[in-house]
Design a protein with these regions (language model features):
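Conserved short loop/turn motifs at secondary-structure junctions
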Residues: 2-5, 103-106, 183-185, 256-265, ...
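C-terminal or mid-to-C-terminal helical accessory/interaction module adjacent to the motor/catalytic core
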Residues: 73, 95, 137-221, 256-260
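Intrinsically disordered, low-complexity regulatory segments
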Residues: 1-164, 168, 466
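Phosphate-rich ligand and nucleic-acid binding surfaces
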Residues: 225, 255-256, 326
């Protein structure tokens, strides 16, 4: 009997696929049954080798060894993944396996994950590709009924390979180059660094901002209020107020406009991450993680998408889905919603995957068994679908201009004619615990041109507002639009990163200490600011990186040459190393941490500083050092804090509370004495119990 081997990206996906195709017998590292073997990767089972694997000299970071340009490229299997790789390799090479199905995630990265494993295993058997946008049983069955040759995705693989190689070349070489120059590990990345630069530029604008005071004059008559434009000085504003108080204001003009606001599009990953950050405070990574969990539970369609439309063959499916949601969701009770499904259907605007929507499986299960965060995300996606197929929001605006004492004042009002999709949106937002911006409607009284009023007047003081710090919501939007104004109209990819990678980029910036979260705000640290300032434009420009993304998209479509792209990347890396061969001595200390002075050295009188593991004398010729993990303090289960160290240096002794006694098993308070013998180690002793 021969088998078809199916390789998924992770165990949970393999389990779902196996259940649908009848591979129900659990084996070591795979499922078997119905003529199928179903195994899995654990993310990237195979990766590019580290630089040190090409040559031992690369284990140390030296300028003279740069640039590092692998030829040929080598691959490794990480130690923690070797067991599963060996299982997959043995399955690929089993004599009774006559064909292979690539069932990794349907996208650029998923293609790369499978191809690396397939090549590393030395397999040459024919491969078909499973391409699905949902983990529902019906979608998996349909996918297996429409498997395509994996060669159809060769261009996608070349795009993924170019992306991975470019990231390695720029990341390894630029990180080593600037780390060596500045004597500190400075992580540089193709997308990460321009993103940091955007944060630094915004921070600089905020710091440079100088608020300016201005004034407005308001006139009032009953419920009517109209305002002047901005007035620069208080004297002029008060003069206008005095003239208008008790005077007559005449309605000079009234302009009425009927307007229509179409529903917003369905969610792609970026818009879902932005809205979840705005409404729930989720980070981009949290939203992606929750969406991935819901996808694997078959409740949500594939989340790593950049499309906000559905394919035209999904019309009937969406009709049924909407009807079911209207019955299921509390916010939909009593809604009169004739669905306009055609608005969300456009096959031309769907590339790898359609927009994110709930599945029919979710309609059956509902919110039962979901965590609170998953419930929030599902509610958000459901309400978006209902909004997207609802009627437009129709309203009328009224702009009335008044003349009073030779000055012009304006009043604006808005009246809703047809609530449309906004009724659903407002119902959803009313269920949220978080504060949301509610639209305040200002209805003007009935007015006629030439109508006259006796008015009172007042002066209001205002200040101009600084630019706002980025939140994950606004930064994701800026990343998505980066470079768009400088690129051709028909450029398909105009941004930093992809929907699937942006969350990880933000997390890495935070982990590396270049960015910190302050509430919802993302703010660059001192090191982040310095790094963005010292790096060249070729690494920090969002426009150049957006051009890369567009080229990668063109490669995936077969419209650009991958070899040309890689040649340009290698040339850029060579030029970078050549240009930055040295820096001035004063700049070499730019990233050195400001040392905290603890006290004076009892041996030489120089300053003693706090290090990561010790308190050390700043005089290199002096050997005085107090180790934080000194056995004296560890035996007594007491942290050797800067406060204790400072007291010992100043007074030769420190009062310490909560010392542990091994003899009694209890704690006690005592005075610890510094007993410096002048040798390599410093001693301590307890003077007396108190």
């Amino acid at each position: 009997m021969s088998f078809q081997l199916v390789i998924a990206e992770k165990p949970s996906v393999a389990r779902s696929i196996a259940a649908v195709i009848g591979a129900t017998e659990k084996q070591n590292g795979y499922w078997q049954g119905g003529g199928y073997l179903v195994s899995w990767c654990i993310g990237h089972l195979v990766s590019f080798a580290e630089a040190g694997q090409y040559d031992e000299k690369y284990c140390k970071w030296k300028y003279e060894d740069l640039p590092i340009l692998p030829q040929p490229w080598q691959f490794i299997v990480p130690d923690e993944k070797k067991q599963q790789f060996e299982i997959v390799r043995s399955l690929l090479n089993r004599p009774d396996v006559d064909s292979v199905t690539a069932a990794t995630d349907a996208g650029r990265e998923g293609e790369l994950i499978f191809r690396f494993v397939y090549q590393m295993a030395g397999c040459t058997k024919p491969v078909k590709r499973l391409w699905v946008s949902s983990m529902e049983d019906a979608a998996i069955r349909e996918g297996f009924a429409n498997l395509r040759p994996d060669s159809d995705y060769d261009a996608l693989y070349q795009s993924a390979l170019c992306r991975a190689k470019a990231d390695w070349l720029v990341g390894i070489n630029a990180t080593r180059l600037f780390s060596v120059l500045y004597h500190k590990t400075l992580t540089v990345g193709r997308v990460q660094t321009p993103t940091l630069k955007m944060l630094v530029d915004r921070d600089a604008k905020i710091l440079r901002f100088q608020k300016e005071k201005y004034y407005t004059v308001g006139i009032h008559s009953g419920s009517l209020k109209a305002d002047s434009g901005r007035i620069a000085d208080a004297e002029t504003a008060n003069s206008i107020k005095e003239k208008c108080t008790g005077a007559n204001a005449v309605c000079a003009s009234i302009r009425r406009e009927k307007k229509t606001e179409q529903p917003h599009k369905l969610y792609d990953l970026t818009t879902l991450q932005r809205e979840a950050n705005r409404l729930f405070g989720f980070t981009a990574k949290q939203t992606l993680d929750y969406a991935q969990q819901l996808y694997e539970k078959k409740l949500l369609t594939y989340p790593r998408t950049d499309s906000q439309y559905l394919t035209e063959d999904m019309g009937q499916t969406v009709q049924h889905l909407v009807s079911d949601l209207l019955r299921l969701l509390p916010i939909a009770q009593g809604l009169d919603l004739p669905p306009k499904v055609g608005r969300v259907l456009n096959s031309k605007k769907v590339s790898d995957h359609h927009a994110i929507i709930p599945t029919s499986e979710f309609v059956k299960q509902g919110f039962t068994g979901l965590a609170e965060s998953e419930c929030k995300l599902m509610s958000l996606v459901c309400s978006k679908l209902l909004c997207a197929i609802a009627a437009p929001h129709e309203y009328e605006t009224v702009t009335a201009v008044f003349s009073c004492a030779g000055n012009e004042f304006t009043a604006k009002g808005k009246t809703v004619l047809v609530p449309g999709w906004k009724e659903i949106d407002q119902r959803f937002r009313s269920t949220l615990k978080a504060d949301t911006e509610e639209e305040v409607l200002n209805t003007l009284p009935e007015l006629a041109e030439g109508q006259s009023f006796s008015v009172t007047a007042n002066v209001s003081e205002h200040f101009t507002s600084p630019p706002k710090a980025y939140t994950e919501d606004t930064l994701l939007s800026a990343m998505e639009r980066a470079g768009a104004e400088d690129m051709p109209e028909d450029a398909e990819r105009k941004g930093l990163g992809t929907p699937a990678t942006r969350a990880a980029i933000l997390e890495k910036l935070v982990q590396m200490g270049f960015v910190q979260r302050k509430g919802k705000q993302l703010v660059p640290t001192k090191d982040g600011i310095n790094l963005a300032v010292v790096l060249p434009e070729s690494l920090t420009s969002p426009v150049l990186t957006a051009e890369w993304e567009n080229r990668l998209t063109e490669i995936a479509k077969g419209n650009a040459d991958p070899d040309e792209f890689m040649a340009e990347i290698e040339a850029q890396v060579r030029q970078l190393v050549k240009t930055y061969s040295c820096i001035s001595a004063d700049k070499q200390n730019l990233f050195q941490s400001e040392r905290v002075i603890i006290g004076k050295c009892p041996r030489c009188g120089e300053n003693v500083y706090e290090g990561k593991k010790n308190f050390y004398c700043g005089n290199r010729g002096c050997q005085f050092v107090m180790w934080k993990n000194d056995r004296f303090f560890e035996q007594r289960k007491k942290a050797f804090t800067p406060k204790i160290a400072a007291a010992l240096l100043k007074n030769g002794k420190a009062k310490v509370k909560g010392l542990y006694s091994e003899k009694t098993g209890k704690t006690y308070d005592a005075t610890v004495l510094l007993a410096d013998t002048g040798g390599k180690y410093v001693n301590y002793r307890v003077e007396r119990k108190e």
